[in-house]
Amino acid sequence: LELDETIRTVPLNDKGGTVVLSLEQVKEGKLFNYACAQCHAGGVTKTNQNVGLEPEALAGALPNRMKNPTTYDGEEEISEIPSIKSANIFRNLTDEDLKAIAEHILLEPLVVGTKWGGK
């Protein structure tokens, strides 16, 4: 699958900025399949299938977070269920790995369309 620059252009921030991912960054993002897909296969959240990883759902998550997992509404910490804080699989992920995974999550809806996140 060859991804042109248009597809590899993903949101950078909430002010409308974008960034073009390199093919190497796209490849590194496949770390998602190793580290996250057990609970988020295809961008669907195993524990709450009403909340996926599609851009619209991510935009509505409050507060914005990456390293402190909470429920979608931000009310409850979920570090006791598989997450970055508790699972052995996440202990070796660096900030660069997390960035690559986040880029993958932003790229997938552009690659697979509405299949990502189950919507």
From Swiss-Prot:
Which domain of life does the protein's organism represent?
A: Bacteria
Q: Which cofactor does it need?
A: heme c
Instruction: Tell me the GO BP annotations in alphabetical order.
Output: photosynthesis; respiratory electron transport chain
Cite a GO CC annotation.
photosystem II
Q: Where in the cell is it found?
A: Cellular thylakoid membrane
Which residues are recorded as binding heme c?
Answer: C36, C39, H40
Keyword annotations of the record: Electron transport, Heme, Iron, Membrane, Metal-binding, Photosynthesis, Photosystem II, Thylakoid, Transport
Q: Name one GO molecular function term.
A: heme binding
Function description? One of the extrinsic, lumenal subunits of photosystem II (PSII). PSII is a light-driven water plastoquinone oxidoreductase, using light energy to abstract electrons from H(2)O, generating a proton gradient subsequently used for ATP formation. The extrinsic proteins stabilize the structure of photosystem II oxygen-evolving complex (OEC), the ion environment of oxygen evolution and protect the OEC against heat-induced inactivation. Low-potential cytochrome c that plays a role in the OEC of PSII.
Name of the protein described by the UniProt record: Photosystem II extrinsic protein V
Recorded source organism is Aphanizomenon flos-aquae
